[in-house]
Swiss-Prot record:
Its EC number is 3.5.1.26. Keywords: Autocatalytic cleavage, Disulfide bond, Glycoprotein, Hydrolase, Lysosome, Protease, Signal. This is N(4)-(Beta-N-acetylglucosaminyl)-L-asparaginase. Its main location: other. Substrate binds at residues 233-236, 256-259. Gene3D superfamilies: (Glycosyl)asparaginase. One of its GO terms (cellular component) is extracellular space. It catalyses: N(4)-(beta-N-acetyl-D-glucosaminyl)-L-asparagine + H2O = N-acetyl-beta-D-glucosaminylamine + L-aspartate + H(+). The lineage of its organism: Eukaryota, Metazoa, Chordata, Craniata, Vertebrata.
Amino acid sequence: MARKWNLPFLLLPLVLGIPLVRGSNPLPLVVNTWPFKNATEAAWWTLVSGGSALDAVEKGCAMCEKEQCGGTVGFGGSPDEVGETTLDAMIMDGTAMDVGAVGGLRRIKNAIGVARKVLEHTTHTLLVGDSATKFAVSMGFTSEDLSTNTSRALHSDWLSRNCQPNYWRNVIPDPSKYCGPYKPPDFLEQNNRAHKEVDIHSHDTIGMVVIHKTGHTAAGTSTNGLKFKIPGRVGDSPIPGAGAYADDMAGAAAATGDGDTLLRFLPSYQAVEYMRGGDDPARACQKVISRIQKYYPKFFGAVICANVTGSYGAACNRLPTFTQFSFMVYNSLHNQAIEEKVDCM
């Protein structure tokens, strides 16, 4: 799926001295993963109120953190093996190629806000764990418990099911039958990589891309990660080029899904590079999915892409339980946030 506008055609009336018809330019543009409408609207109204592309991404993702979108963004969701909720987020400025990100952030609700502070007040790209929390507190954020009755109940139920599912392999006791603690066996058998069936509702990261009316780009993500992950695990979301990527010379992209798989292919960076090479956004997204399918045909994932002329698209990998991917779009041709769907390939 794609919506395309030909830039030379848009510029022709200006060359001839003819004013453009109001609303004929699709910019600005907001696209985000999943039907998180309030996040889309928060980003859009930030833009029309005079905010930058970076401001829009931050406000949009922050709305999802506040609303706990799908239980997979923000506090109170996706407890790890010990029952704690931690957060990952990143934000990227495609004009300056600056990035701020946090991974395994504890006790701070506004992860995307902390990522913005990393971008603005340090020369680093990524801060993690307890030290990221200390940084956040120094920046004025409040330290508070991220667990809720809902996340505690999820963890309790998981323990009652012998810690299933989990993400261990080649350890004893058998992780498919028992809880840990685990340790490596004396002799490691070399067997084929096992594929774990995934719950698609445990991966609904918000990824957002914004193209400002000036052509400036930004992208970002926010997530509470994988349910019942091994403590310390960080997925694709806070990694530039994996979770999201933006470059004013081409466009922006964001990914959602099985972060451990996506991280190995830098799908957002690859999508932007495909657009730089001339592919329209829909085709760029499709090529990214095809590239991963060659190695992981059963992976769960989707990508959104937008170029600097206002064209956008998306693609996803088809599974028995995942045949369509929903994403949100708001541009100057719409008077509201629109949910669009693409058939998986």
